[in-house]
Regions:
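Active-site T/S-Asp motif of two-component receiver
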Residues: 54-55
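As written
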Residues: 49, 63, 94-100
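Acidic, metal-coordinating helix/loop segments flanking the phosphotransfer/catalytic sites
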Residues: 33-51
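Acidic catalytic/metal-coordinating carboxylates
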Residues: 35-36, 62-66
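Two-component/phosphorelay signaling modules centered on CheY-like receiver
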Residues: 14-32, 119
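C-terminal output helix
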Residues: 89, 107-117
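Receiver (REC) domain active-site loop signature in two-component systems and cognate sites
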Residues: 58
Length: 123
């Protein structure tokens, strides 16, 4: 028996969080959503997460800071960052740090789907 791969969504915008969770489930993945980086880091789902979708601009800890914290703790998760305020310098830094994709909101569903599928190990 195989279980569905878990995609965690971290975004302070409830509408975006819920829509991403529904989209991931429609693609056949399991999905959990969190309102903050702290909520995700404290979650039992942290170690089950196969791919992380995180907002760049969140209070307290940004998506970039969350990714760096995961890397520093030896728990790098394939990460897709999303933002309503894209910045080339931030994108370049994030990609150089190892972030898989840096996408602009509103997110293009096909582009996001391609990024998620690229993050998943081959079956």
């Amino acid at each position: 028996m195989t279980s569905k791969q878990l995609i965690s969504v971290v975004d302070d915008d409830r509408f975006f969080r819920d829509s991403m969770r529904r989209l991931m489930r429609s693609l056949g993945y399991s999905s959990e959503a969190f309102a903050s980086a702290a909520d995700f880091l404290a979650s039992p789902f942290l170690f089950e997460t196969a791919c992380l979708i995180a907002d760049v601009n969140m209070p307290a800890m940004t998506g970039i800071e969350l990714y760096r914290r995961l890397v520093e703790s030896k728990r790098a998760i394939p990460t897709i960052l999303v933002t309503a305020y894209p910045n080339d310098d931030d994108r370049i830094r994030a990609e150089n740090d190892g972030v898989l994709c840096y996408l602009r909101k509103p997110v293009n569903e096909q582009e996001l789907t391609d990024c998620v599928r690229g993050a998943m190990p081959a079956a």
